[in-house]
Amino acid sequence: MKTRITDLLGCQYPVIQGGMAWVAEYHLAAAVSEAGGIGLIGAASAPPEVVREQIRKTKELTDKPFGVNVMLLNPNAPEVAKVVVEEGVKIVTTGAGNPGKFMEMWKQAGVTVIPVVASVAMAKMMERAGADAVVAEGMESGGHIGSQTTMTCLLYTSDAADD
């Protein structure tokens, strides 16, 4: 299957596994990547050393692309953001905040950045900040999102997207 997302991420299918806190660990991330999608390690509130270990274990199980979901409310987010670069991870999704302060570091390291957004305004802000794509997510997701439904967010965000 060939789509803009498969081209961007180097995967077989346009499927990005959620970066679910305490669930999305290296076994799941590697399995999803091996199946042709993009597996994610959910960094959640983990210390940087734990995220580093998860990345290394994922690399032992797959040579396919995978990423890390950085929860920006995590007090360790700045250190986790650096670990992503140090370990050569090429895909980052973000949630629970604005990744703007990490964007330059990630982009200089060749990281594809995909923030999770809950509104058109946030999607446009992320586009201006250099995001490669966004995930439009609503209140059903169980994440740190507002009161808009996913379908509403998706429709408005896709209408507003430059491409």
Residue map of PLM features:
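Active-site entrance/lid segments in N-terminal catalytic domains of soluble metabolic enzymes
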Residues: M1-L155
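Conserved small/polar residues in nucleotide/adenosyl-binding loops
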Residues: Y156-A161
